[in-house]
Amino acid sequence: MKLKLKKLFRIKQKDPHCSVVVVAAGSSERMGGDKMLMTLGAKPVIIRTLMAFQQCPMVDDIVVVTRREKIMAMADMIKLYDISKVSQVISGGATRAESSLAGVSAVRKGAKLIAIHDGARPLVSRELIERVVREANEHISAVPVIPSTDTLKKIDENGVITGSVDRASVVRVQTPQVFDADIIKGALTKAVEKHLPITDDCSAVDMMGFSTYTVEGDTGNIKLTLPEDMVLAEAILKSRGE
């Protein structure tokens, strides 16, 4: 009689691994300076972002996408802080899709999952990273979301309210967004070639007809856009004891 060992012993599944693209190629116009280099809790914003992925065991390598004129300064800073998982620092494109495509094209060969993250979200936690990676490993595409707590209205071209939006059907999407490597490469290639108006990376996947699953996001995982966001980020760090 043959016995199947899987029925006798619980086999521990290995955690999925991924490559990461950190997009830090924006102009930072609304911030009034290069937010990636601004100090947050005694460290540059971009370094805090990269350290979150450096310390996550599910992450194999990191590609940083920045502006061409910032490549050397970024590379020197990464070396100074010993962010060893960064394999490349490359220049981005004119649009988010172009920058993301450059990044996913530069990750290590053989990567099955690719996470794309805003460089301006330095407070991302290891727990959130792992939660999204696990979901994408199950469903090929996953993003973190948080509920909308504001009242949402529709307006016409004149700015007149025409109706309300059910908050139960609306969420705020964060990063990292994690995808099957082949699918995100194909989706971003199509978005760039056809000049599709995407505002985040899962939009490109959605336009190809693939479903994107969601996981619980983190209200502390804010995106630094305006000067007052830095004040909030410092407060969040303080509340975390950092």
Label for each model-derived stretch:
Residues K2-P16, V171-E242:
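Conserved alpha/beta core of the MobA/IspD/sugar-nucleotide pyrophosphorylase nucleotidyltransferase superfamily
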Residues A94-E157, Q174:
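Conserved beta-loop-beta/alpha segment of the NTase-like Rossmann-fold superfamily
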Residues K153-F179:
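Short, flexible, basic/aromatic active-site loop/helix in glycosyltransferases
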Residues T39, L123, S164, V178, ...:
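Short aromatic/basic micro-patch
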Residues Y81-A94:
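Conserved donor nucleotide-binding strand/loop of the catalytic core
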Residues V22, I46, G103, H117-D118, ...:
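Residue-level signal for inorganic ion chemistry
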Residues M72-M77:
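Acidic helix N-cap motif at the loop->helix transition within catalytic regions
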Residues R10-I71:
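N-terminal glycine-rich phosphate-binding loop and ensuing alpha1 helix
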